[in-house]
Amino acid sequence: MRYIVSPQLVLQVGKGQEVERALYLTPYDYIDEKSPIYYFLRSHLNIQQPEIVKRHILLTLRMTQLKGYLGNLLDIKDDIIIYSHKNNLEYSYVDNTIFNPFVYTQKKTLLKNDSFLYNVYPGACDFLVIWVVRACDTSIPEFGSYEDVDNNIIKFETMLMEVFPQLDLDITVESKFNNIFRTNLKLTGLKKIIQRVQDLDINYKSLLSRYDEHFINMTGNHFILNDEQLNLSIWDLDGTLALSSDGDTVMINNVKLFTDLVSDIDTQMERIKGDITYKVHLATPINSRIKLDIETSFIFIETATNNILLSSDKKISIILAKNHISIKVKNHIPNIEKYFTFLVIAINAMFNSVQKSADFTKVETVYWSRICQNTKNKNRKPIIINYLDPGMKKISNNFYRSDEKEVFINDNGIMFTCMDPLGKYNKVGFLNIFHDMRKYCIPCCFLHDQSHRSTFSSCVHQIDVEKKIVSPYILNFGKVVTESKMSFLPIIFDAFLNDGMTANMEQDNKRLKETSGYHIVRCCAGDDIVRLRTTSDIIQFVNEDKNILIVNDMVYFPMNASDIGKKIHILIQEIVHEVMIVKKKESSDKIDFFPPNYKLLKDLFPKQTIQTPIQSDAGMVLTTDGFYIDGKLFNEDLSSKYVTFTKNVIASDAVAKYFSPLFKYVISEAKDRFIKTWMINIMIHMNVDPNNIIPTLEKYYPNSGRAQIN
């Protein structure tokens, strides 16, 4: 979403508090008639045409700095008083009554401060109105003062207005509020809240659960086992969690909803922690190693680490990365994270232009510096030059050659050449792996001329070359595999999947000579690279792709056995590859690929793969593949609109012993909790006779882990 910098309003008033000048400050060239500022002008002040001024008050200024700036803006050389009708600025009464120089009272103590604008005016990011009056036009001229403007502020503002049209303010904000409170709701309060949700009929999903030992949080159709015995969860209309409480604490994501629901309840609230962290994703990358060329202490304080900034009051920390910014604040200030992101983007545009290729480092998990690097006797990394030598021959629009050197010009106008002091690596070529993965033309220096290479033809002459020919050389497992390559499987899976299969290799190398069928690793078909960074990414991919995935020494299956497809994927350096069977005749270099024998892994799945009815009644059937009503799979989200009670589930010794061989494949901090989750999802519906547990388990879970696969 594109961030819009809100307009600001400066009002200069006279002796009778009449408006003499109304300055509409904006970095844009027009009035935003939908803005709250314009509505305030038109509806409350009856001003239709204010002065449009292309300037911007920095919200990071102290009151003395702000007063100097406003004097410069209005060209006033006299003492002035600044104030606001919404918040106290320079002066405030001890009881926080809003200060107004025209209605001053001596009955209350008046305090003066030099705080930062965004602290004393919390809504300033969206709505800032400042009133200015000459001190001599009030009854308290002694409260006025004159401040010289800081020229660095004016210089920065001028540069800001110059670069503003080119700023990409398309950002996405993720926030993490530590919005957990201690409360006295208890079970009685939670019951009142859920009753109010149902009485209001507001279509919010709600769930109140209480269990004897472990709380099972039902999110959609999934069970999540927690140690809480009592829990209330309410979801917004878009499915996000609005609030959750165990009666003693409450986590609030939707403040308005919570306030409405507890309006008739005497709640006691104590914030446990107040820090808020925002992660702001940027549409256009920035330079994370920021360097300021002018004095900007009125905005940021630079730290010893050049990608970390502090606000001037040191209460807001900002960590810069190429594609996102993390902002941590002590207290909630509306949209302050967007405003500071705007300032960071602006400063990057002013002082830290990003050369997309000059500082190129990696694509996905592959680093340029590791593949094209200088060593003692090899100088393979190209250098950047600023001009072409006279007399160089133009080979194409982006490639020039002379007897002494070759020059490649990338899409950003950066010129690369090779100048090996030893006179060996002086031929410009391109790295195949980057071109195969992302069609990037990343230069490197070679011993011999590269013009006959297909990647050279694509990068220099824009000739598309089909990568249909696959090299018969098989790489060791662990490297990212491109379209023209293949690699061995990891040793454990090579031995398992290729049991009984052979591949004849040429002596002294890894060139495939002949095979009637052998499992290897290939890149996935298509141009899109799938990258899985976390366990959550892996699980989501497997369930959506509905195929088996190998990650290190683990095998991931889709949740439902009937969903398992006929492909096998494998993760290498976070990138998804495909397991295939390769076939090759000794008399030909032609290589053919066939689907893998997926059943070898699928048969390891411990669940019964044939849909078997477990229990049925009145058109409702519970099977090993789901719950059906009148033949239709029931997949409605669980809700407190439908209430049921169950006894606490206890994992018997017989069940635990039966599944114990499987536990070495299960990631769990508590095996007993794992058994209970399994029991809740399946066994509780079977009405299992304690004396007949083993036969029932063998019927539905034949692969308990005891059977040895030969």
From Swiss-Prot:
InterPro entries given in the database record: Poxvirus_early-TF_lsu (IPR007532)
Protein's cellular compartments: Virion
MF term (GO), any: DNA binding
GO term, biological process aspect, one: positive regulation of DNA-templated transcription
Pfam families xrefs: Pox_VERT_large
Key words of the record: Activator, DNA-binding, Late protein, Transcription, Transcription regulation, Virion
Gene Ontology CC: virion component
Protein family according to the UniProt entry: Belongs to the poxviridae VETF large subunit family.
Subunit composition and interactions: Heterodimer of a 70 kDa and a 82 kDa subunit. Part of the early transcription complex composed of ETF, RAP94/OPG109, and the DNA-directed RNA polymerase.
Role of this protein: Acts with RNA polymerase to initiate transcription from early gene promoters. Is recruited by the RPO-associated protein of 94 kDa RAP94/OPG109 to form the early transcription complex, which also contains the core RNA polymerase. ETF heterodimer binds to early gene promoters.
Protein name: Early transcription factor 82 kDa subunit
Native species: Vaccinia virus (strain Copenhagen)
